[in-house]
C-alpha cells in the first residue's frame, strides 16, 4: 500500500509538471476518451490541479476599470421588439449526411434541412464530442468559454453549485421576460434542479413534472415530440413574453450493436466507414429522423400562435462514434449546426459561431443588449485580443472582485418553481380497504407518503391515486412527492386529514 502511495505521488508530481509546462493536451472534449488516451493519473491530476478560470497577469484595477468603461460606453442599436425566445438544444443531433460515404434510403432530416436553408443558420463550434451536454448548454446560456476552465471540468458541478452567473435568462428578466427551462429527462441530471436557480430561471419543468402520456425509445429515453405540448403549455402560462430554454434527450447514446427486438428502422443506412458501428449508426439515424419530425411539429405549433416568436435550434455535440475530422465533410468533429426561425420577418444572415456566441448573436439580431458578457460578444468579437479580454471578464465575474459590477453581484438565485402546473390534493378519503387521493397533475413520478412514510400506491390518472390496504384517520398527513429513480425529492404537496 505504501509503494502504491509513493508511485501515485510521483506520477502526480510528474504529470503536474507536464501540465504546468504545457507539454500535454489540456482540452478534454470527451472525458471518457481522455481517460483512455492519457490514463487515469494524468486525467485525475489535471482535473484537481486545474479547475476554474485562471487569473490572468493583466487582471489589475486599471485594466478592469478600462474594460468596464469601454463596455459602458459601447452599445448596439436597441429595438422595442420583444418576441418570445425559445432555444432548443437537440441531444446528439447533427446532419448525418455530413459523414463521408454514407447512403440513406431517404433523407432523415428534411425539416432541419429546409429550415437551415430558409432561415439564418451556420455551423456551431461546441466544447465537447460524444458527451458533455451540460457544457454546451452552459456556454450557450452564459456566453462563457469552456476552454478557459480546467480540462474536463463541468461548471454545473463546480462553480455553479454555489454562485450565480450572468446569463441569457437573467439578462432577459431585466426587460420583463418570464424565464423557463424544460428537459424531458431527470431533473437531477447534471444537478440542473440546483443550477437553474443560479442561472435566473423562474420555472424548471423536468420529466418528473410532465404528463405520463409519452413514448420512449427502445432504449428507454423519452421521445422529443412530448416537448411540443410542454412548450405550448409554458407559453400559455404567462401573459408577458417568455424565454424558454429546452433540452431534448431522444438522441442520447449509447446505441445498440444489435437492433432491439421488434424495432424496424424506417431509414436504411449503408456505407458507414466503421463496419462494427453500422447497426448502431442506423439506429441513431432513425432516432434523429424522429427528432426531425419533432422539429417540424414544433415549428407548425409556433406558426399557429399569434405571438411573435423566435426559435433557435442546435445540436449539443456529435454522437459517440469513431468520427475523426477526416470522416466528416465539414472536417470538424466539434461542429454541429443551428438555425434561427421566426414567425415574423428577419433577414437571413448565415454565419459560423462558437456556442458561447450564440445567445449574444440572436439577441443582437433582436436589438437586445443586456449584461456585460452579451454586450462584450456583440461589440468586441472582432478585436484582436477578444479571447484574452473575455477570459479576464469571466474570471472577474465568477472568481474575481466583481469589478465589472462595482464589486457586488447583481444576480440573486431565483426561487425555482418545479413544473408549470401545480400538483394539488383536493381530497383524501377511504373507500373500502384503500385510500383515494384526488387532485391534479399526478404522474408516474408521484409517490405517496403518509405521516412521512412512503407507501405503495397506484397512479390511476392525473387526478387520482389509490393506496391499497390502507385507511387514513383524523390528523394523518398525506403527501404527494415528486422524485425520480434517485429518490431525491423535488417537490411535495401535503394534505391534512380532518
Where are these regions (language model features)?
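Long, solvent-exposed extracytoplasmic domains/loops
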Residues: 85-89
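N-terminal secretory/membrane-targeting segments
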Residues: 1-83, 104-123, 158-162, 166, ...
Amino acid at each position: 500500500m505504501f509503494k502504491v502511495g509513493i508511485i501515485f505521488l510521483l506520477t502526480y508530481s510528474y504529470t503536474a509538471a507536464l501540465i504546468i509546462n504545457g507539454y500535454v493536451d489540456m482540452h478534454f472534449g470527451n472525458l471518457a476518451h481522455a481517460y483512455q488516451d492519457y490514463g487515469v493519473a494524468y486525467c485525475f491530476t489535471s482535473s484537481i490541479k486545474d479547475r476554474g478560470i485562471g487569473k490572468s497577469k493583466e487582471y489589475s484595477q486599471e485594466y478592469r476599470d478600462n474594460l468596464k468603461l469601454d463596455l459602458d460606453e459601447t452599445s448596439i442599436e436597441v429595438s422595442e421588439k420583444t418576441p418570445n425566445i425559445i432555444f432548443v438544444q437537440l441531444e446528439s443531433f447533427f446532419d448525418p449526411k455530413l459523414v463521408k460515404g454514407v447512403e440513406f434510403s431517404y433523407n432523415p432530416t428534411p425539416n432541419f434541412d429546409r429550415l437551415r436553408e430558409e432561415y439564418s443558420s451556420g455551423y456551431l463550434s461546441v466544447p465537447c464530442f460524444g458527451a458533455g451536454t451540460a457544457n454546451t448548454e452552459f456556454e450557450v446560456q452564459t456566453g462563457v468559454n469552456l476552454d478557459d476552465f480546467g480540462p474536463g471540468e463541468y461548471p454545473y458541478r463546480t462553480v455553479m453549485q454555489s454562485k450565480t452567473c450572468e446569463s441569457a435568462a437573467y439578462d432577459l428578466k431585466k426587460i420583463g421576460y418570464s424565464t423557463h427551462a424544460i428537459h424531458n429527462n431527470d431533473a437531477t441530471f447534471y444537478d440542473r434542479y440546483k443550477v437553474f436557480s443560479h442561472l435566473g430561471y423562474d420555472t424548471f419543468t423536468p420529466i418528473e413534472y410532465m404528463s405520463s402520456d409519452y413514448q420512449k425509445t427502445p432504449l428507454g429515453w423519452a421521445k422529443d415530440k412530448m416537448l411540443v405540448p410542454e412548450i405550448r403549455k409554458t407559453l400559455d402560462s404567462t401573459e408577458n413574453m417568455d424565454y424558454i430554454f429546452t433540452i431534448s434527450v431522444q438522441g442520447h447514446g449509447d446505441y445498440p450493436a444489435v437492433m432491439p427486438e421488434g424495432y424496424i428502422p424506417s431509414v436504411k443506412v449503408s456505407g458507414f466507414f466503421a463496419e462494427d458501428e453500422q447497426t448502431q449508426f442506423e439506429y441513431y439515424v432513425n432516432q434523429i429522423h424522429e427528432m426531425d419530425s419533432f422539429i417540424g411539429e414544433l415549428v407548425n405549433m409556433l406558426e399557429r400562435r399569434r405571438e411573435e416568436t423566435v426559435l433557435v435550434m442546435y445540436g449539443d455535440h456529435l454522437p459517440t462514434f469513431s468520427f475523426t475530422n477526416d470522416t466528416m465533410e465539414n472536417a470538424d468533429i466539434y461542429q454541429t449546426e443551428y438555425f434561427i426561425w421566426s414567425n415574423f420577418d428577419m433577414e437571413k444572415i448565415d454565419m459560423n459561431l462558437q456556442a458561447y456566441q450564440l445567445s449574444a448573436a440572436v439577441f443582437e439580431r433582436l436589438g437586445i443588449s443586456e449584461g456585460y458578457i452579451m454586450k462584450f460578444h456583440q461589440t468586441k468579437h472582432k478585436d484582436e485580443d477578444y479571447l484574452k479580454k473575455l477570459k479576464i471578464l469571466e474570471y472577474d465575474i465568477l472568481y474575481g472582485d466583481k469589478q465589472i459590477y462595482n464589486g457586488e453581484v447583481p444576480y440573486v438565485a431565483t426561487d425555482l418553481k418545479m413544473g408549470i402546473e401545480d400538483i394539488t390534493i383536493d381530497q383524501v378519503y377511504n373507500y373500502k380497504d384503500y385510500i383515494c387521493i384526488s387532485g391534479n397533475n399526478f404522474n408516474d413520478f408521484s409517490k405517496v407518503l403518509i405521516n412521512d412514510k412512503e407507501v405503495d400506491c397506484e397512479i390511476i390518472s392525473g387526478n387520482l391515486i389509490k393506496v391499497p390496504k390502507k385507511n387514513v384517520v383524523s390528523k394523518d398527513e398525506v403527501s404527494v412527492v415528486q422524485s425520480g429513480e434517485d429518490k431525491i425529492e423535488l417537490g411535495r404537496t401535503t394534505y391534512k386529514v380532518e
